Structures are given as structure tokens and as C-alpha cells.
From Swiss-Prot:
Protein name per the record: U1-pseudomyrmecitoxin-Pt1 subunit SS3
Manganese listed as a keyword: no
Organism in which the protein naturally occurs: Pseudomyrmex triplarinus (Ant)
Major location category of this protein: secreted
Tissue: Expressed by the venom gland.
Family: Belongs to the myrmexin family.
Coiled coil: none
Remarks, miscellaneous: There are 6 heterodimeric myrmexins which consist of a small subunit (SS1 or SS2 or SS3) disulfide-linked to a larger, quite structurally unrelated subunit (LS1 or LS2).
Amino acid sequence: LFGNIIDKLREKIKKYCNKENLDKACSKL
């Protein structure tokens, strides 16, 4: 359950990073 929450947060962060195009900040994900 906890891992699923992390995955969802990671997906949201990736979508936000792609949207804002923050390559340096998001390359770690």
C-alpha cells in the first residue's frame, strides 16, 4: 500500500517535471 502511494507521487512528479520541463531537478527520478 505504501509503495503504491510512492508510485503515484512519483508519477505526479514526473508529469509535473515534464510539464514544467525541469530537467535538472527531475533527472534524479
